[in-house]
Design a protein with these regions (language model features):
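Short beta-strand boundary microenvironments
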Residues: 114-158
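N-terminal Sec/SRP start-transfer signal
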Residues: 1-32
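Mechanotransmission and gating elements of multispan inner-membrane complexes involved in transport
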Residues: 84-88, 107-113, 151, 159-161, ...
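Extracytoplasmic
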Residues: 51-55, 75, 91-96, 111-116, ...
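A conserved hydrophobic position in a structured secondary element of the catalytic/binding core
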Residues: 59-60, 72, 121, 147, ...
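Hydrophobic, regular-secondary-structure patches
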Residues: 27, 31-117, 135-136, 226
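Flexible glycine-/small-residue-rich
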Residues: 60-62, 100, 120-122, 172, ...
Length: 235
C-alpha cells in the first residue's frame, strides 16, 4: 500500500510542466518576500539614522507629509531660540538650523540629470544634523555645493560626474562641487547642500522650509509645541 506522501510524489512526476510552473511561482513569492523585507529594514535603518530624539523640526501646518511644500517666515529661527529655553547655545551660537528644502532638476556636465533634492543650509546645520560629516573637500562658499555620497545614485549619474571640482546645474545656475559628505546612512546622503542665501536667491524665495532645533538633554519639546500653538501657521 502506498503512503499518502507517495501519491504526491507520483503526481509530481506525472505532470512535470504543472509542477515546474508551481515551483517557479513559489520561488517568485519567496523572492518577493525577501525583497520587501529587505526594503523595509533598509528604510527603517535610514529613518533611524536620520532621526535624533533631541532634534525638533518646525514647519508649516499641513506639510508633514511633504516638507517641500512647507513655507515659514525667515525670522522663525530667531523667534524660536528667544522663546524656547531648552535650546542649546554654545560660544554665542544657537543650535537652530534654518533650511530651505526642495526637489529640483539637477544636471551634471555629461548627463541629462534627474530630479535631485537640494537643501539650503547655514553653518549651524552640522551642529544640529550631527550625523553629517564632511569626508572630502570643503564646506560650500558662494556658488558652491557639497554632495552626499549617494547623490549620484539619486540622480542616475556616475560618481565621477559629481567629483570635487566638477560642476552641476540647477535652478538656472551653474554650481561648483566643493566637497562630499556622509551621514551614517541617513537620508541626507542623497541630497545636495548649498548655502541658504544662495538657494533663496536662485529660487526667488525669502522664506524657509523648516527649522531644525537641537534641544538640551532633559529638555522637553513641549515648549516648542506651545510656541507653535501660539502661531497657527506652524507645526
Amino acid at each position: 500500500m502506498l503512503l499518502p506522501w507517495e501519491y504526491g510524489v507520483r503526481n509530481l512526476a506525472r505532470r512535470p510542466v504543472r509542477t515546474a510552473l508551481t515551483m517557479m511561482a513559489l520561488a517568485t513569492v519567496v523572492m518577493l518576500v525577501f525583497v520587501v523585507v529587505g526594503f523595509i529594514r533598509g528604510l527603517e535603518q535610514s529613518l533611524t539614522a536620520s532621526g535624533d530624539q533631541n532634534v525638533v523640526l518646525v514647519y508649516s501646518v499641513n506639510s508633514e507629509e511633504n516638507i517641500e511644500n512647507s513655507s515659514i517666515p525667515a525670522r522663525t529661527p530667531s523667534l524660536l531660540t528667544a522663546s524656547v529655553d531648552g535650546t542649546i547655545k554654545r560660544f554665542g551660537l544657537n543650535h537652530a538650523s534654518p533650511e530651505l528644502y526642495a526637489g529640483t532638476r539637477v544636471k551634471s556636465e555629461n548627463n541629462e540629470g534627474g530630479l535631485g533634492l537640494v537643501r539650503g543650509v547655514t553653518l549651524a546645520a552640522p551642529l544640529v544634523r550631527r550625523s553629517v560629516q564632511l569626508v572630502d573637500g570643503a564646506w560650500p562658499s558662494d556658488g558652491e555645493v557639497m554632495v552626499g555620497r549617494l547623490a549620484a545614485a539619486k540622480l542616475g549619474s556616475r560618481e565621477d560626474e559629481l567629483a570635487i571640482g566638477k560642476s552641476i546645474e540647477f535652478e538656472g545656475r551653474s554650481w561648483n562641487i566643493s566637497g562630499r559628505f556622509a551621514a551614517g546612512g541617513a537620508a541626507y546622503e542623497s541630497e545636495i547642500w548649498c548655502r541658504l542665501s544662495d538657494f533663496q536667491t536662485v529660487s526667488k524665495r525669502q522664506d524657509i522650509s523648516l527649522v531644525a532645533l537641537l534641544l538640551a538633554p532633559g529638555s522637553s519639546p513641549a515648549e516648542v509645541e506651545l510656541f507653535c500653538k501660539e502661531r497657527t501657521d506652524l507645526e
